[in-house]
């Protein structure tokens, strides 16, 4: 797998997340009825960073939850020795019923992850609204799903891969394009 280009460095990621945070506050007229829910794994860390910035902007905390969509995927891959799916569990600290839930993920591609996340959310409650925030939108949708907040649109070919590295998991912040 050959790296073609670094499309976002640490400063660009920081700026994109700051902009998304402002957009979330502006669109929702504050964050009183909002919950950020990160899709495991990198979506959680992005959601936590957004919550930190929103806290700085608004002077109040926004709840952050973690969503494991393993059992909701239509392309479930079995990753354990006994052929059972590896489930890490969801952790959403508040009832999402009648809340504005902002789903957070690192990359929006086919839309299948987001569809699975919406199914998982509906099993946990009935939000008044679901919004989507992603660091990168790379196109190639297979489902009618569109992000409300996008850090950067990066058009790619189907022969390319986007790799998101975050400090929390990869000891650096950057987004790169690779040839498959």
Swiss-Prot record:
Domain of life, source organism: Bacteria
Matches recorded under InterPro entries: PRibTrfase_dom, PRTase-like, PyrR, PyrR_bifunctional
Top-level enzyme category: transferase
SUPFAM superfamilies xrefs: PRTase-like (SSF53271)
Alphabetically ordered keywords of this record: Glycosyltransferase, RNA-binding, Transcription, Transcription regulation, Transcription termination, Transferase
Any Pfam family the entry gives: Pribosyltran
Known EC number: 2.4.2.9
Catalytic activity: UMP + diphosphate = 5-phospho-alpha-D-ribose 1-diphosphate + uracil
A biological process from GO: DNA-templated transcription termination
Keyword field contains Methyltransferase: no
Renumbered ranges of motif PRPP-binding: 101-113
GO MF, any single term: uracil phosphoribosyltransferase activity
Task of the protein: Regulates transcriptional attenuation of the pyrimidine nucleotide (pyr) operon by binding in a uridine-dependent manner to specific sites on pyr mRNA. This disrupts an antiterminator hairpin in the RNA and favors formation of a downstream transcription terminator, leading to a reduced expression of downstream genes. Also displays a weak uracil phosphoribosyltransferase activity which is not physiologically significant.
Record text on subunit structure and interactions: Homodimer and homohexamer; in equilibrium.
Family: Belongs to the purine/pyrimidine phosphoribosyltransferase family. PyrR subfamily.
Protein name listed in UniProt: Bifunctional protein PyrR
Gene source species: Bacillus cereus (strain AH820)
Gene from which this protein is expressed: pyrR
């Amino acid at each position: 797998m050959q790296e073609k280009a670094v499309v976002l460095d640490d400063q660009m990621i920081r700026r994109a997340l700051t902009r998304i945070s402002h957009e979330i506050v502006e669109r929702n007229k504050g964050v009183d009825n909002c919950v950020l829910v990160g899709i495991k794994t990198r979506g959680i860390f992005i959601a936590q960073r957004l919550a930190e910035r929103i806290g700085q902007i608004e002077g109040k905390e926004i709840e952050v939850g973690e969503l494991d969509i393993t059992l909701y995927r239509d392309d479930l891959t079995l990753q354990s020795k006994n052929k059972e799916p590896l489930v890490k569990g969801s952790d959403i600290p508040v009832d999402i019923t009648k809340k504005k839930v902002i789903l957070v993920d690192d990359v929006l591609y086919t839309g299948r992850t987001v569809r699975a996340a919406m199914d998982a959310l509906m099993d946990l409650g009935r939000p008044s609204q679901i919004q989507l925030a992603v660091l990168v939108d790379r196109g190639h949708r297979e489902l009618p799903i569109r992000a409300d907040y996008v850090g950067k649109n990066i058009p790619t070919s189907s022969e390319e891969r986007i790799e998101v590295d975050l400090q929390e998991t990869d000891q650096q912040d950057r987004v790169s394009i690779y040839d498959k």
